[in-house]
């Protein structure tokens, strides 16, 4: 039993790496076996010297007590390297092939405690427009209106177009106030004329003038939305009294979508905040506007047109005749002879060769007396064709004959 156990221990010796080696005992007769020893699964790079049976048993027992757990190493394969070298296109996958979520690297947090290691080049400054900017050389198109006439107007920071004398304003009408009275009060603060551009907001009561009946009005009560509001008020000075002349027209929409409107003839109460856009201008300044426009053209370098209207009547007449001179088109030199005939179809089939030479010979022009002349000429042409056929040895055959 001891020898058998010693043999088993000698045959299966465990190394310090947890790997087993197998050895076969030599033949008792001292000869060599023909079969080679089996190749171990995991060959140990460290060779174990042969020992005696008691020493081998002692080593095996010590190694078995202090043996470490076996481990395995996973080496990268060629497929993995090929996949890494292969460039993937398109959007990266959100899930792995096994269904697990792909873990992506979180971006570096942006905070003051984390210093930036990468240095970015300074941003290049773009080329400026330079001193040759035409817009800077010219005067500004918009400027604040600081004329003494408009100091009383309730418009803060209003823009005045150069040469237009038009200033926009925004009026806010609170709930329960009359929009018409608000606009009239604003127009009486200055000497300028006003025009209503637009408005929006809810209306609770409105009185409209009916165009069908003279002097008739109609009042609507409810909640309506302003679609449009237009009108103007001009200042009139007559007999030392200053008054305003003008009117407004409105278009409203009801809660059911019905649209109606007309000229305002009474109350125009706001059901909520109403915003009104008005513009003020100086009326009767047509001549000054023309002068300002001329000055602006000269300032901007616009040259006036070179059209001159100081020309004499004779020169104007000569230009007209030169433009409206008639062009004489010469008549064509080719002339066609027309032959009167009463049987155009017969002449077309019997005189095919002559028809090719003169396409107008078979067109009837009119008159009944020319039939005999056409028949005689047709017979002469037939005689000429027969003579040509006999000369060239051909058989003459009429166009209206059916070949057998």
From Swiss-Prot:
Q: Name one Pfam family in it.
A: PCC
Q: Which residues form the PPC domain?
A: 163-308
Q: Where is this region: Disordered?
A: 1-51, 70-100, 113-133, 359-404
Q: Where is the signal peptide?
A: none
CDD domains recorded for this chain? DUF296
Transcription regulation listed as a keyword: yes
Where is the sequence biased in composition, kind Polar residues? 7-19, 71-83
Q: Where is the composition biased (Basic residues)?
A: 123-133
List the record's Gene Ontology CC terms alphabetically: nucleus
Instruction: Assign the protein's first listed, main location to one coarse class.
Output: nucleus
State where composition is biased (Pro residues). 35-51
Q: Which residues form a coiled coil?
A: none
Q: Could you state one GO biological process linked to this protein?
A: xylem development
Cell compartment(s), UniProt: Nucleus
SUPFAM superfamilies per record: AF0104/ALDC/Ptd012-like
Q: Which tissues show it?
A: Expressed in both procambium and xylem precursors of the root meristem. Also detected in the endodermis in the late elongation zone and onwards.
Record-annotated DNA-binding residue ranges: 86-98
Composition bias, Acidic residues: 373-393
What the record says about disrupting the gene is:
Misspecification of tissue boundaries between the xylem and procambium.
Keyword Ligase tagged: no
> Which keywords, in A-to-Z order, does the entry hold?
DNA-binding, Nucleus, Transcription, Transcription regulation
Relate the assembly described in the record: Homodimer. Interacts with AHL4.
Domain note: The PPC domain mediates interactions between AHL proteins.
Q: What does this protein do?
A: Transcription factor that specifically binds AT-rich DNA sequences related to the nuclear matrix attachment regions (MARs). Acts redundantly with AHL4 to regulate the formation of tissue boundary between the xylem and procambium in the root meristem.
Q: Which PANTHER family match?
A: AT-HOOK MOTIF NUCLEAR-LOCALIZED PROTEIN 3 (PTHR31500:SF18), AT-HOOK MOTIF NUCLEAR-LOCALIZED PROTEIN 9 (PTHR31500)
UniProt protein name: AT-hook motif nuclear-localized protein 3
The organism named in the record is Arabidopsis thaliana
